[in-house]
Swiss-Prot record:
The keyword Plastid applies. Its main location: plastid. One of its GO terms (biological process) is cytochrome complex assembly. GO terms for cellular component: chloroplast thylakoid membrane; plasma membrane. Keywords: Chloroplast, Cytochrome c-type biogenesis, Membrane, Plastid, Thylakoid, Transmembrane, Transmembrane helix. One of its GO terms (molecular function) is heme binding. It comes from the Eukaryota. It comes from Guizotia abyssinica. InterPro entries: Cyt_c_assembly (IPR002541), Cyt_c_biogenesis_CcsA (IPR017562), Cyt_c_biogenesis_CcsA/CcmC (IPR045062). This is Cytochrome c biogenesis protein CcsA. The chain crosses the membrane at residues 9-29, 44-64, 71-91, 98-118, 143-163, 226-246, 253-273, 287-307. The gene is ccsA.
Length: 322
């Protein structure tokens, strides 16, 4: 009873803190010069990480096994992974706007985990025989960490695409306006066109465009490195899962839905890393592959659980109302 109450308290404290954190991050994005809200949000995210760590330890003691046996526990661990990825760059780079994505991911996953939809699996249960192995920590933790890293990296790529295509849209819109002006041969219009050209050239080198260019470079830089880290975790998770499957079921690979989609996820991000080796495919082209990978991860992690079939069906659940 004590552990259950403590778990309930830690869950709501961490969710409340991360809700405040994402609000402060939005304020920081609206006003880039506001430093104090940013520092407060980072300290709040560290507090969230500590609360989630305490929550996982409490559930571990309460249940008697590592808390990765069902979808609820995996969502809490995913939130913990997001918060870990969030605070690591903070200790290296004190000011980093990219952490807004990880804060949003944390509040989304934790909000879903603590919602009424997963009420039926909030209480710890006895592990099924297939999960009573030392490989549980190795395999499942690596897979969840890989999902967290790959999702964060993919979201950075999505942001890169949005900013890039937005710039292209406004640039083409401006060019169409200039072409319309060229259809008139009046001296006054010609003068305005020349003035617009000078303005455009000046604007190109303005502080706003310089900041956008730097921000796009940061998005590309971090997405590549975070996805590379996630790909390593995914590879380790798949290999350890194959060894565990051989011990539990007598075969390294069975092509059940979860294994199939994990393999598809691995292929997609292997293609992404390959595109990074080609200079002509970097930037928006590789970001498109990562965006596809974002959808594939959610199918692999969450979508397959809705089916409730295959060797990994113990992680499935039924949607219920609160």
């Amino acid at each position: 009873m004590i552990f259950s109450t403590l778990e309930h308290i830690l869950t709501h404290i961490s969710f409340s803190i991360v809700s405040i954190v994402i609000t402060l991050h939005l304020i920081t994005l609206l006003g880039n010069e506001i430093i104090k809200p940013y520092d407060s949000s980072e300290k709040g995210m560290i507090a969230t990480f500590l609360c989630l760590t305490g929550l996982l330890i409490t559930r571990w003691i309460y249940s008697g096994h590592f808390p990765l046996s069902d979808l609820y526990e995996s969502f809490i661990f995913l939130s913990w992974s997001f918060s870990l990825i969030h605070i690591v760059p903070y200790f290296k780079i004190r000011k980093n706007d990219l952490t807004t994505i990880t804060a949003s991911s944390t509040i989304f996953t934790q909000g879903f985990a603590t919602s009424g939809l997963l009420n039926e699996i909030h209480k710890p249960t006895i592990l099924v025989p297939a999960l009573q192995s030392e490989w549980l920590i190795m395999h499942v933790s690596m897979m969840i960490l890989s999902y967290a890293a790959l999702l964060c990296g993919s979201l950075l790529s999505v942001a890169l695409l949005v900013i890039t295509f937005r710039n292209i849209f406004y640039s083409s819109k401006s060019n169409n306006f200039l072409k319309l002006n060229e259809s008139f041969s009046f001296g006054e219009i010609q003068y305005k066109n020349e003035r617009n050209n000078i303005f455009q050239k000046t604007y190109f080198f303005s502080d706003k465009n310089y900041y956008k260019a730097q921000f796009i470079q940061q998005l590309d830089y971090w997405s590549y490195r975070v996805i590379s880290l996630g790909f390593i975790f995914l590879t380790i998770g798949i290999l350890s899962g194959a060894v565990w499957a051989n011990e539990a079921w007598g075969s390294y690979w069975s092509w059940d839905p979860k294994e199939t989609w994990a393999f598809i996820t691995w292929i997609v991000f292997a293609i992404y890393l390959h595109t990074r080796t080609k200079k002509n495919l970097q930037g928006a082209n590789s970001a498109i592959v990562a965006t596809l990978g974002f959808l594939i991860i959610w199918i692999c992690y969450f979508g397959v659980n809705l089916l409730g079939i295959g060797l990994h069906s113990y992680g499935s659940f039924t949607l219920t109302s609160s």
